[in-house]
Amino acid sequence: ITSVFTAKLDELRRGRSLVLENDHTLILGFGDRILEVIRELIEANESEPDAAIVILADNDKEEMDNMIRDNISDFVTTRVITRSGVVTNINNLRKVMAANAKSVIIMNSAASWRPEDEKNLADALVLKSIMSIIAVCDGDEHPPIVCEIHSDRDRNLAENISNGDVKALNEVSVLSRMIAQLALSRNGLSVVYSDMVGFDGNEFYFYQPDGGWGGELNFGESLNRFNSSTPMGIHNANGEIILNPPKETPVNDDDELIVFAEDDSTIFYFNEPVFQPKVNTIPSSVVKPRSHRIALLNWTTKTGIILEKLCSYLPEGSELCTYVSDKLPEMDILKNSLSESYPHINISIKEVDLNDLEKLDELEPQEFDSILILSPGGTTIEEMDAYVISLLIRIRQILISKSKKWPKLITEVMDSDNIDIILNSGVEDFMVSNQFVSQIMAQVSEEPLALDVYDDLFQAEGSELYIKPASFYFDFSEKESLTMPYGECVQAAQLRNEVILGLQIHTDQKNRDKMFGIVLIPDKKDEFTIRKEDGLIALAEDET
């Protein structure tokens, strides 16, 4: 009896025993992002009385448990259960009740900055994991799967591997497209995105009222049928995602509105307009897209995509200057290809020692509109952030000595613990890469269609998010400020064929406690005193 009991204890300690769960979130793998994913899922599960996250990885169970306990103090209503084993093994997947899971998240074992052969192998393991889950379900419909895959080819393969829901995220593609948009908008757009992807803030929901739309309805009318929640677009009966459609686009009985809201419990649809706007005109002056001068520091897996996306956005006369420590032939090949496709943009790639203060000074950083500082990779996340911070300090020293207007400094941060240091370096827009990707993966595990919205939001065609000056919407020629209900801002944006998600108060732009001046989806009756320096957060086709 003693030996059997000891063997059973040893099995439990090694994490080999059966998991008796249903409707749980199953995570396969245990990497850098695991803590951020768990935090997001705990937030998403707050309204559930008893939720479970089950993790299967080839790590030691005790090590996984200790790491989770050491970094997460409050699990609210969520239980986190770990099991040790090979994630592609069908018997192991049966032990963690993969077929009964609410959703499955597959972590990629290779970071985006790792060598290509390592990433290819990691992608192959993700594909094998998907096939193993399909096998566990005996070919029947499987739980929704969200995974991260580096190769576009393998991503397409993953999404078409079965009849079930498989959503594959390409970290480099998503982050690159977002960074490109940050370079073109006013400061603060990263705060909007961070709020949108995290469960601890506002999110978009696919909404249809139980009693129907209450008669004929078009998209423009739908904007005024919610007090604070804001429709961003339509998910039609054919499965299409259409963000900021023309206002006369009908919302049919089978369509869902894509609604930006604090929570699905805060979405209330009214059959009649909730606000009667008085604004019926907007400033008539034509705003032309202005040329930009943008610098990119360092060559990474993201640089090429960022350059391509910026070229697709930028108007004639713009300049893109990339500075690298070692110039390679493939960089010139990309530059020549882009120059041929976008002859109206001046593109250059130059070799510079970015660690040399004098060489940096010769670049005249103060003459750029935006400077994008990318992390070139490293052995650890801390090492990568340390490099970025040291480069920021050198640029900051040059800008202080020039005492001119600073360019917009944008950087990516790997570890959210380094945000305060980054902000004190003069950065006005930043993106916590690990956190951002983890949040999207967690969100897509709860709502698979969310990834389709992000894919639409981060491409040059159609509408993207911008923070535009209030003077685009209201005439300030005779007044320094205007006081009005937020509903008038919604109406002014609609007259410009835009949807707004909120405001940016200029005086609070440096205040982290006030979300850097960002106010999202207030009630339409809430009054604001708006100055021309303030901004409106718009879903629009371009920056004008």
Give short role names for the model-derived ranges.
Residues 3-544:
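Cytosolic regulatory regions of ion transport systems
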